[in-house]
Amino acid sequence: MALLQISEPGMSPAPHQRRLAVGIDLGTTNSLVAAVRSSIPEVLGDERGRALLPSVVRYLPDRTAHIGYRAQEEAVRDPKNTIVSVKRFMGRGLRDVANIEHSPYDFVDAPGMLQIKTAAGVKSPVEISAEILATLRQRAEDTLGDDLVGAVITVPAYFDEAQRQATKDAARLAGLEVLRLLNEPTAAAIAYGLDNASEGIYAVYDLGGGTFDISVLKLTQGVFEVLATGGDSALGGDDFDQRLLCWIVEQASLQPLSAQDMRLLMVRARAAKEALSESDSTVIDAVLESGEIVHLTLTVEIFDQVTAHLVQKTLAPVRKALRDAGVAPDEVKGVVLVGGATRMPSIRKAVGDYFGQTPLTNLDPDRVVALGAAMQANLLAGNHAPGEDWLLLDVIPLSLGVETMGGLVEKIIPRNSTIPVARAQEFTTFKDGQTAMAIHVLQGERELASDCRSLARFELRGIPPMVAGAARIRVTYQVDADGLLSVTARETHSGVEASVTVKPSYGLADDDIARMLQESFREAEHDMKSRALAEERVEADRLVEATQRALETDGDLLSAEERTAVEALMATVREIATGEDHHAIHAAVEKLSHGTDEFAARRMDRSIKSALAGRKVQELG
C-alpha cells in the first residue's frame, strides 16, 4: 500500500528533501525519540549521548519544571512535587488508580481525569506528559537541525479511547503534530519484521515500567495483521519494584515510613532488581531520615520467590490472546520481548518455558518500540524508499453495537475487527409519526444492553412523520487508525443527521475487558434465551399495536363476533408476553397473525377501492 503525497502546484518538494518525522515511545518509566537517518532507524540521544529520558517531571515554586534525569535525582528529597509513572494516570479518574495509598501525591478528583497538586499549581496528566514530549521534540529538532512535521507516538494496545485522546492532547500541547498513535507491540513488530524480513505468526510480549501488552501477529508478504491483543494497563516493572519495596520494609521491620524514605527505598529496590539481571545477588544499603541503616542481601532466588505471582499474572493474558487468535503455543514462530522489564531472568525463563523456545532479544528491548515508531513516522511523512511498501492492520478488543427495541444489542463492528474500519446498518421507526430516535452506543459481547458498557447516547431529531417502518435511518460506526470511535445516524429521506465522537470520561481497565469476555462465554446460553424472549416480546408488542390501530381505523369491516375474536387473541398475546416462555409468545403471535389474515385482506380491498374511486379504466391503462 503505497502512500501518495500531493503538493500544491509549484510546491512539490525536491527529490533530496526529506520531511522530518520522529517516533516517540512515551513510556511509563523512560521515554525515547527515534528517527530514520540515512535509511537506518536510530534512537536520538541527549547532549551527553543518553538515549533514555526518565519519564519524571519535578515542579518548582517558580512554576518551572525539571524533566528527566535531573528530576529523577531530586525525587527522593521532593517526592510530592516529582511526578513519576504519569502514564498510569492518563485518561483516568481517581477511582481507576490502583495502589493510590502508596503514592506520595496530593490528588484532585477533577471531572473526567484526576489532577495532582504541585508547587507550580494543579497539573493534569496531560500537562505533565506534555513536558516530557516537549523535551523529546526539542532533542529531536536540535539533533536533526530542523522543525518536525509530526510524530508517531506509541501507546499500549489496551489503551481505551480516553487514554488515547489524552495522549494526543498532550502531544498537541507539546507542539507536536500527531501523525498516528501506534500500539507498542505493533511498533516492535515493525522493527523486527522489516529488519529480518520474517514471515509467520509471532507473539510480542511487552512488559514495560507500568503496562503489559501481549499481541499475536501474523506477518505475511509485508502485511502486518494483529490476530489478537491482551494485557494489563496496571502491571509492569514498577509492580516488581513495589513488591521488592514491601519485602525490604518487612525484612527490616520499617513502619511507619516518611514519603522521602519510601522514595529512597523504591530507588534502591529498582537498582537491586536491575543488578540481578547481571548477577546472582546484590546488597541493598540505605540510611533513613531517622538515621536507621538498612542493609540486606537479595538473591535471585529470593527475588523470584517474592515476585513469582507477578510473573504468572503476565501469562494469563498470553493464554487468552492465543485462544482468541486460535493459535497454539507451538504454532508461534518467534516471541519478541519488548520493554526494559523483560531483562529480568525470571521473565525470560517463564516466557521461554511457555512457548517452548528462546525469546528473540537481538534488538534492545528498551529501544525497539521507538525504532518501529520511527519507521512508521518516516513512511507517513512520505520518505519511504522502494521496498518499504507494507501494510499495518490493528484490531479492536471489544465489539461495538447499538441498542435496539427490547433492550437488545445489535453488533455493528465485531471484536477483533481490523482497524481502521467503518460499518453501517439501517434501522427504522417503531411507531407511527415517530420524529426522533435515541441512539445508544454500546461496547461488549453480551446480547442485552444492560449487560454491556455504555459509551455514548445521542438523539437523531427531525425525522419526517411516517407510518412505522417507513423511515430509514442509516447508522455508521467508524473507528480510525488511533482507535477513536465516531458514530453517525442519518435519515435517508430528509438527510437529517446527528453524530457523536466517543471520548469516555473514565477509562476501561483491562480486568474489566477480561471480565466482560469471560461473562460473555459463561452466560452465552442464558443470553441467547434472553435475546429470544426479548425479540418475541418486541414482535408481540408490534403486532398488538398494529392490530389495535387497524381496529381503530377499519374496525367496521368486522362483525361483532369477529372483532371479539380478534380482541381475545390480542388479550392472549398481551398476557403471555408477560411470561418467560418465548416459545409460547411466538405461538400466540402466530395465532394472532393468522387470526387477522382475513381482516388484513378486507383492509387491502378497501384501500385499493379507495385509490381507484372516480378513475376511468382508460386512465389506468
Curated annotation (Swiss-Prot):
The keyword ATP-binding applies. Keywords: ATP-binding, Chaperone, Nucleotide-binding. One of its GO terms (biological process) is iron-sulfur cluster assembly. Gene3D superfamilies: 1.20.1270.10, 3.30.420.40, Actin, Chain A, domain 4, Substrate Binding Domain Of DNAk, Chain A, domain 1. It holds the Pfam family HSP70. Belongs to the heat shock protein 70 family. NCBIfam families: HscA, PRK05183.1. Chaperone involved in the maturation of iron-sulfur cluster-containing proteins. Has a low intrinsic ATPase activity which is markedly stimulated by HscB. This is Chaperone protein HscA homolog. The gene is hscA.
